[in-house]
Amino acid sequence: MADLDDIKDGKDFRTDQPQQNIPFTLKGCGALDWGMQSRLSRIFNPKTGNTVMLAFDHGYFQGPTTGLERIDINIAPLFEHADVLMCTRGILRSVVPPATNKPVVLRASGANSILAELSNEAVALSMDDAVRLNSCAVAAQVYIGSEYEHQSIKNIIQLVDAGMKVGMPTMAVTGVGKDMVRDQRYFSLATRIAAEMGAQIIKTYYVEKGFERIVAGCPVPIVIAGGKKLPEREALEMCWQAIDQGASGVDMGRNIFQSDHPVAMMKAVQAVVHHNETADRAYELYLSEKQ
């Protein structure tokens, strides 16, 4: 119990200065609860407003694909260079050391595989477990225009509703079926629907024509997917174009861990996302770091 002796009245109330309430500036997130804003502030660097996520959740439907055969050997050395880790709860518990001390976005949809229809997903994580694992967000695919569009949207709604109760953001990931065209019109539709359902972050693909319109039409932050493995210079150009056109970061997997020099590539991506380096400058950094 505090000592009650010698209690003195406060005097320095600065009555001439109004209380300062610093606004939360992340796009579309100013009205969220404190806990959710706190988690988002761990995902997005408060100084730059951007993020570099390392995605290695591919095994939930692809199995041990190239580069992800051994998470402990191939991916663990990259943890310190990422802002955020994106993975499944199985990998988090079995491979990621708790002392890593990086914010985690947990894969929350699944129940599909590359052997069947990819869009046929269900919610694969309870919000209780997401909280138990101290995650900063959960992520689920949304397949607009697919056979299972309705179910994938319901999955997002379910996660958003559960997340609002505990201050857990939901990231909607726009999946694309084999027969869908990857263009501005489609991604504008998909990202807007996901945001309208309440997702606080949207992960989508970069397109060369009209990406700035996708960003402008989406009321919450967009991070781009890395997609298939590209030559390092091309991947850095994609990053730069996306950030220049309004994206709030990248969530890259194969373009990092399938690179011949993944640590150097991670540092180059960080330079683009957080230090506004051009693709040329970032590629020079990559070349110097890989030696």
UniProtKB/Swiss-Prot annotation:
Gene3D superfamilies found in the cross-reference section: Aldolase class I
Oligomeric form and interacting partners: Homodecamer.
HAMAP family: LsrF (MF_02052)
Enzyme class: transferase
GO molecular function, one term: acyltransferase activity, transferring groups other than amino-acyl groups
Upper taxonomic lineage: Bacteria, Pseudomonadati, Pseudomonadota, Gammaproteobacteria, Enterobacterales
GO CC annotations on file: cytoplasm
Locations listed in the record: Cytoplasm
Native source organism of the sequence: Escherichia coli O139:H28 (strain E24377A / ETEC)
NCBIfam families per UniProt: PRK08227.1
SUPFAM superfamilies: Aldolase
Protein's recorded name: 3-hydroxy-5-phosphonooxypentane-2,4-dione thiolase
Domain of life: Bacteria
Chief location: cytoplasm
UniProt-listed InterPro entries: Aldolase_TIM, DeoC/FbaB/LacD_aldolase, DeoC/FbaB_aldolase, FbaB-like, LsrF
Gene this chain is encoded by: lsrF
